[in-house]
Amino acid sequence: MKKYIVFILSLFLSLQLNAQVSVKKYIVISEVMYDSPLNEQIAQGIPYSNGEYIELYNLENTAVDLTGWKLTGGGKTEIYQFPANTIINPRSTLIVAYQYKDSGFLLNDLYSYDGYEMTTILYQRKIILSNSGETVSVVDNVGNVVDYITY
């Protein structure tokens, strides 16, 4: 009888642990622009990483609050934390673009959005995407990797 109870408790505990590890994939990385059409050797002092971006898509029918979430790149210091109250609307995209300090660069200056609903664009200076490849991850506010892409 003791063996039976221990078996049932072990089974129950393992199911609970598996349920906690599994993360629902509702925010996905839908696009990565790691090599923008900007000429990377335009002129001395012109930042070459402007135009790089990561696009996220909300698969849910409800808005998702990204407060406390992070976007991570390949380097140890490449961590962008979403500002408080950052919302990604249902079935919508959110773009996180690189913007070199004091460059005044706007993604709208580089890409045309004619005929498309305007997407929310956040600018950051933490993640510079490698042209030779890396892994980019979306991490929720409790540390679970919600999605990642390796290119």
Regions found by a protein language model. Name each.
Residues 9-18:
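Hydrophobic h-region of N-terminal signal peptides that target proteins for export
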